[in-house]
């Protein structure tokens, strides 16, 4: 068999294949002009601008890692407004009566008796050493010399009053107590010539010295107990012995 008859057939096959590749390239470049031949791809251009943010996605599922430690407590916030008052609770049951042992009352009575005995002993000691007692009055002096206003303040400080004899026995007790002339709780400061006690009551007992009261110098509004037990009016600004009386 001769090889030459098949040579045309081979050439025809090569031409057909080349035509097929040309058609394929042209089909891919339909927008290119017919005069421009197909070629290899060009170099990539610069990146374009970022696009706008998309919409927020849904919350994802919790991660699978371990949970972190709890953070430190935050600062205390401002106090809130007081809440409304609650409803009253139910009334409680009546309690059992208290117990008071007999020994408590007897002990209190014995303590009172002991205190009274001690007070009586102190009064007797004071009467013997510093003062004089007549009836329900106790007269006491600290031996100080002062003005009438200071005598009043001193006696008030000890819840007492300036000594004021209501009868001869009390006047004698004060006289026996003092070694110096002493103020009495009697004045006529409000009404001249009308002597009253410090509560404003008129006197029911007096023991004026002869010629007294005479208001010599026009300012003798206080009363002085002399060493002989009689009275004399003197200025309240003068200084004399302080004597106080205590009710007992």
UniProtKB/Swiss-Prot annotation:
Modified residues (4-hydroxyproline): 47, 73, 79, 82, 88
UniProt GO cellular component terms: collagen trimer; extracellular space; multivesicular body
Biological process terms in GO annotation: complement activation, classical pathway; complement activation, lectin pathway
Pfam families: Collagen (PF01391), Lectin_C (PF00059)
Gene3D superfamilies referenced in this protein's UniProt entry, alphabetically: Mannose-Binding Protein A, subunit A
Signal peptide: 1-20
InterPro entries membership: C-type_lectin-like, C-type_lectin-like/link_sf, C-type_lectin_CS, Ca-dependent_lectin, Collagen, Collectin_CTLD, CTDL_fold
Region of interest: Disordered: 43-111
PTMs per UniProt: Hydroxylation on proline residues within the sequence motif, GXPG, is most likely to be 4-hydroxy as this fits the requirement for 4-hydroxylation in vertebrates.
Coiled-coil zones: 112-130
Biased composition (Basic and acidic residues): 49-61, 93-102
Residue ranges of domain C-type lectin in the record: 134-245
Subunit comment: Oligomeric complex of 3 or more homotrimers. Interacts with MASP1 and MASP2. Interacts with MEP1A and MEP1B and may inhibit their catalytic activity.
Function noted in UniProt: Calcium-dependent lectin involved in innate immune defense. Binds mannose, fucose and N-acetylglucosamine on different microorganisms and activates the lectin complement pathway. Binds to late apoptotic cells, as well as to apoptotic blebs and to necrotic cells, but not to early apoptotic cells, facilitating their uptake by macrophages.
Official protein name in the record: Mannose-binding protein C
Gene that this polypeptide is encoded by: MBL2
């Amino acid at each position: 068999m001769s090889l030459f008859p098949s040579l045309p057939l081979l050439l025809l096959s090569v031409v057909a294949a080349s035509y097929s590749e040309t058609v394929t390239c042209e089909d891919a470049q339909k927008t290119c002009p017919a005069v421009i031949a197909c070629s290899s791809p060009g170099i990539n251009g610069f990146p374009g601008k970022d696009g706008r943010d998309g919409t927020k996605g849904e919350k994802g599922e919790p991660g699978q890692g371990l949970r972190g430690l709890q953070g430190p407590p935050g600062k205390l916030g401002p106090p809130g407004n007081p809440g409304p008052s609650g409803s009253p609770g139910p009334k409680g049951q009546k309690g059992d009566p208290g117990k008071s042992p007999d020994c408590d009352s007897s002990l209190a009575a014995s303590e009172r008796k002991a205190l009274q005995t001690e007070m009586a002993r102190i009064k007797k000691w004071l009467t013997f050493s510093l003062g004089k007692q007549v009836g329900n009055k106790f007269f006491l002096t600290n031996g100080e010399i002062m003005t009438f206003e200071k005598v009043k303040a001193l006696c008030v400080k000890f819840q007492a009053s300036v000594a004021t004899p209501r009868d001869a026995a009390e006047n004698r007790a004060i006289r026996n107590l003092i070694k110096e002339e002493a103020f009495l709780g009697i004045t006529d400061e409000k009404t001249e010539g009308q002597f009253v006690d410090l509560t404003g009551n008129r006197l029911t007992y007096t023991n004026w010295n002869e010629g007294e009261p005479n208001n010599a110098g026009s300012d003798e509004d206080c009363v002085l107990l002399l060493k002989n037990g009689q009275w004399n009016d003197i200025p309240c600004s003068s200084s004399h012995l302080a004597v106080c009386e205590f009710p007992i």
